[in-house]
Amino acid sequence: MASRKGENSEMEEIESEKNGSVVGIWRTLDASANRSAEAVRVLEDILRFCLNDAFLSREAKAIRHELAVIFAREDLQARIRLRDVLRDVGVSSKVAKTPPRTEMRHVFAANAARASQSIRSLEECSRLVVPAVTASFEQLRYRIYSLEKAAMTIITSQNKLADISLCVLLDVDQPQTEFKMLVAKLLAAGVKMIQLRD
């Protein structure tokens, strides 16, 4: 019962703010927590099931679990108690047009941006009500940036190699004129990748 009493006094203190700015901060933390967890889950799924990258999918999973540990902290539970979806003015607003996501890289990039932006919001708002977690959010945001860079490098490389059905290995130890003629013939025949060997 003492816990319930403490919870009620915390809520009264939060709700007694004249302009509701503290309530707004908690609601921002709640929305950003949900957004970041959802986005990181999408990143993890793409890394695991589309790229089959064990290392990067483990990193995404670790980030997601670290976020969950932070969100479970007792000093962050006011965000859930102050959740008010029915009066959220942004629930019914729609953007005019979302850019088309026709490839997996578009989905990955959009969710990496969503994750880093929402974690940045968590970082900034937590400074005002639970500064003890701010540094953790900052560190996680930088890890998202690194994860995005590594994954996009892999995705770009895979896209470049997707069209290549034949790779020709050429020995460079031959006269230069013959070598140039052979390369020209291979390119004219549609070869898209040539590897040079000594």
List where the protein language model places each region.
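Intrinsic disorder/low-complexity segments
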Residues: 2-4, 8, 197
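Conserved N-terminal beta1-alpha1 strand-loop-helix module at the mouth
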Residues: 146-198
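Structural preference for solvent-exposed beta-strand-turn elements
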Residues: 6, 10-34, 38-158
